[in-house]
Amino acid sequence: MKIFCAYLLTLLLASLALPLQAATLTSSDGKTTDIGGIIWKWQRTMYNNDTKSEPADPSRYTILLMPEGHLSVHLDCNAGGGRYTLDGSSVTLELTHTTMAACPPGSLAQQFIKDLAAARIAFMGGSNLYLDLMYDSGTMKFAR
């Protein structure tokens, strides 16, 4: 048991010595923007079939990109987390766990989860973060 605890302590100390990977978005012109450590509030998703999903209260639908690829989300009446990758402007978001409270009628939690899973390209427009969905099916807009 002592050896196992010493091994775990060694791993912990080694991980603390590594530099943290930041969530840095790189545009096509080479400009970089740090989008990590910010609570991004979902404003809406505009779909390419002229429909949209728009939460009444954006603060109930958020994402937080943390160091080392960790993702934290607020899904209306639930919370969750997972992993993300960001390479230039290419992005993937993967939810690995959520709480399971029953949200009230009219909740957009399931649509928000679906849209996050479909995100493939990230870019900035002013101070807003945009996520283009796969198959050019739509764009999510987030504000600080």
Regions found by a protein language model. Give the residues of each.
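Bacterial N-terminal signal peptides
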Residues: 7-19
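Lipid interaction determinants
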Residues: 2, 18-144
